[in-house]
């Protein structure tokens, strides 16, 4: 019988400090998350310096709690995994330095994990029988991609944003209509009270005919222009209609391109990953389109959509099998790309 691989994973790329113990990439023994949302809400967005300081305060306790919840000793671990990018450099360094210290002190291999790969791997935890190849729509505050997962750790990017990520556009529009941070959940909630067909916000058009790329900066500008025009005319702004119409434009763009990619790649499974995968409109719309096209749609749980260390532990397991380890010179790479 093969030995179980137990990995302690650490995630600190933005405003969540998280540690988890994951067995064989799919079984989560613990997944402790310390969120800073309440702190950053006052500032209307994540303040990098504040995020780094809060990570420093939380990380020891979070790691200790993850080990305790897993009912395990440090010596039983097979490896230490950590997010090294993309993300905020100061925030990444906190998790990275802590993981390096553990790796050195315990004499356990260190595994540097790409945060985007972690989001994709959250689906392996939720869906125990999911195996490549499949298509994955990765959509979060910092990233928007359509990825063909050829094998574990092997990816082909089929479409990506050329400017703002979808989650970034949500945050900016939420700020403009006075909802504050975090924009995604607040727009999702308000949109339920609005008419999604009330305002026609345009979708980006590209010169290249067959591209599956995204662009959200023009859509964001259209919303801002609409708000300015209404204010100049001194007309009342229905915030729920703005939220619903904006959300429909984003979700339709995401789902249309993903379905086109599925046809090109002839896949019968699409996984969705990243913070925006928690969005109720995106979930409903892509499931309906999946049913029409006979494609199975997979999501992680809401907890696994947002930043967490369990997904990092899952991705790390498949790197462990390839002996894809890092040395103690591993550094934070804030603009890290997904390996193609």
Curated annotation (Swiss-Prot):
Cofactor comment: Binds 1 Fe(2+) ion per subunit.
List of residues binding substrate: 138-142, 171, 184, 188, 279
Gene3D superfamilies in UniProt: 3.30.420.40
PROSITE patterns for the chain: GLYCOPROTEASE
Gene Ontology annotations of biological process type: tRNA threonylcarbamoyladenosine modification
Pfam families (UniProt xref): TsaD
The protein's Enzyme Commission number: 2.3.1.234
Keywords: Acyltransferase, Cytoplasm, Iron, Metal-binding, Transferase, tRNA processing
SUPFAM superfamilies cross-referenced by the UniProt entry: Actin-like ATPase domain
Cofactor: Fe(2+)
Keyword Acyltransferase: yes
Record GO terms (molecular function): iron ion binding; N(6)-L-threonylcarbamoyladenine synthase activity
GO cellular component terms, A-Z: cytoplasm
Keyword Nucleotide-binding: no
Binding-site residues for Fe cation, renumbered to this chain: 115, 119, 307
Compartments where found: Cytoplasm
Record's catalysed reaction(s): L-threonylcarbamoyladenylate + adenosine(37) in tRNA = N(6)-L-threonylcarbamoyladenosine(37) in tRNA + AMP + H(+)
Homology family: Belongs to the KAE1 / TsaD family.
Function: Required for the formation of a threonylcarbamoyl group on adenosine at position 37 (t(6)A37) in tRNAs that read codons beginning with adenine. Is involved in the transfer of the threonylcarbamoyl moiety of threonylcarbamoyl-AMP (TC-AMP) to the N6 group of A37, together with TsaE and TsaB. TsaD likely plays a direct catalytic role in this reaction.
Protein name: tRNA N6-adenosine threonylcarbamoyltransferase
Organism field: Clostridium tetani (strain Massachusetts / E88)
Designated gene of the protein: tsaD
């Amino acid at each position: 019988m093969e030995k179980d691989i137990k990995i302690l994973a650490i995630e600190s790329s933005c405003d969540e400090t998280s540690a988890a113990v994951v067995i064989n990439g799919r079984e989560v023994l613990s997944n402790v998350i310390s969120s800073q949302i309440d702190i950053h809400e006052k500032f209307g967005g994540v303040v990098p310096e504040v995020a780094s300081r809060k990570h420093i305060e939380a990380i020891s306790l979070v790691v200790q709690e993850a080990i305790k919840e897993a009912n395990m000793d440090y010596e039983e671990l097979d490896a230490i995994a950590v997010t090294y990018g993309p993300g905020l450099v100061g925030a990444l360094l906190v998790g990275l330095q802590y993981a390096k210290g553990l790796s050195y002190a315990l004499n356990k291999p260190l595994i540097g994990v790409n945060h985007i790969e972690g989001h994709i791997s959250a689906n392996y935890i939720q869906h125990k029988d999911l195996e490549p190849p499949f298509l994955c729509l990765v959509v979060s505050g910092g990233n928007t991609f359509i990825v063909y997962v050829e094998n574990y750790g092997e990816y082909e990017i089929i479409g990506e944003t050329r400017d703002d990520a979808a989650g970034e556009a949500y945050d900016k529009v939420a700020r403009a209509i006075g909802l504050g941070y975090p924009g995604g959940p607040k727009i999702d909630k308000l949109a339920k009270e609005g008419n999604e067909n009330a305002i026609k916000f345009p979708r980006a058009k590209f010169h290249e005919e067959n591209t599956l790329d995204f662009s959200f900066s023009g859509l964001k500008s259209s919303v801002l222009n609409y708000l300015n025009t209404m204010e100049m005319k001194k007309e009342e702004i229905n915030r729920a209609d703005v939220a619903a119409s904006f959300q429909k434009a984003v979700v339709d763009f995401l789902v249309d391109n993903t379905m086109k990619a599925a046809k090109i790649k002839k896949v019968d499974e699409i996984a969705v990953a990243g913070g925006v995968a928690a969005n109720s409109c995106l979930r409903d719309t892509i499931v309906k389109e999946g049913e029409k096209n006979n494609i199975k749609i997979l999501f992680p749980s809401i907890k696994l959509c947002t930043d967490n260390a369990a997904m990092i532990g899952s991705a790390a397991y498949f790197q462990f099998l390839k002996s894809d380890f890092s040395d103690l010179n591993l550094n934070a790479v804030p603009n890290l790309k997904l390996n193609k």
